[in-house]
Regions:
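Catalytic histidine-centered segment of alpha/beta-hydrolase-like enzymes
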Residues: 198-212
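Gly/Ala-rich beta-loop-alpha elbow adjacent to hydrolase catalytic centers
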Residues: 71-76, 80
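Acidic catalytic loop of the alpha/beta-hydrolase fold
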Residues: 169-174, 201-202
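Hydrolase active-site cap/lid region
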Residues: 86-145
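Alpha/beta-hydrolase active-site loop
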Residues: 42-63
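Short alpha-helix in the alpha/beta-hydrolase fold that links the catalytic acid
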Residues: 161, 175-184
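Short, surface-exposed "cap/lid" segments of acyl-processing enzymes
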Residues: 1-30, 34-36
Length: 231
């Protein structure tokens, strides 16, 4: 789920996965209001929260799972991308589905700062605070956030997992430009499904049928199953 949401957000995907024969595990992560807080009680934009995704995979493995498909909304997408590039369990991830994801935090923060008319020098100073250990006295974070490590447009070449990426061009909170850039850089592994008119993480609300069909078709291809033809 995304920042500010909880594990109810992914409920909309459970029927699609169930129909495809997949079990679902809806997780919470630190500081989301359900899971225990971190020591500083601050979001790290995915730079640490991915460890909770890793813990959930271990939980699933202990109960019989052998492979995993990750799905993440918004910041949850950033967690999934960190997991597949940093965890020793990444080899068990068969695929990733991203709905309105943050694939580059600098791009998103720049956009939001622009909406708020925050001057460029102040933005730069804020990024330096977030990314440095000494900035913790101002940010309240217990550790620096590595914003470069969260940029998967720059790190596109490092990705190796089949990915379904869905984003709306009408998303005014996390613009689709980053997702489009990633898809353009990695057409070998990224299947990009654009939407128009949907707000942030509202693809299902806007066109649930198309959203569900995109996931079903992609999972069928991943599983090597011929999907049923649409009526």
């Amino acid at each position: 789920h995304g920042r500010g949401a909880d594990r109810r957000e992914p409920l909309r995907a459970v029927p699609v996965f169930h129909e495809a024969g997949h079990s679902s595990l809806l997780i919470s992560y630190r500081n989301d209001g359900v899971a225990p807080n971190s020591k500083d009680g601050r979001y790290a934009l995915g730079d640490t929260e991915w460890e909770d995704v890793e813990a959930s995979i271990r939980f699933a493995l202990a109960r019989g799972a052998t492979q995993v498909v990750l799905m993440g909304w918004s910041m949850g997408g950033a967690l999934a991308l960190q997991l597949i590039t940093r965890s020793p369990l990444a080899e068990l991830v068969r695929g990733v589905i991203l709905d309105s994801p943050v694939v580059d935090w600098i791009r998103v923060l720049d956009h939001q700062a622009g909406v708020l008319r925050i001057p460029g020098p102040i933005r730069t100073a804020a990024y330096q605070l977030i990314g440095s250990g000494w900035g913790s006295r101002f940010t309240g974070q217990s550790a620096a956030i590595n914003l470069a490590r969260l940029d998967f447009v720059a790190r596109a070449a490092e990705l190796a997992v089949p990915t379904l990426l869905m984003h709306s061009d009408a998303d005014t909170f996390v613009p689709s430009a980053g997702s489009r850039a990633l898809a353009d850089l990695r057409p070998d592994i990224v299947t990009y499904v654009p939407f128009a008119g949907a707000g942030h993480t509202r693809l299902w609300n806007y066109d649930g049928k198309r959203w569900g069909q995109a996931i079903s078709s992609w999972i069928s291809e991943l599983d090597g199953v011929t999907p049923p033809s649409s009526p």
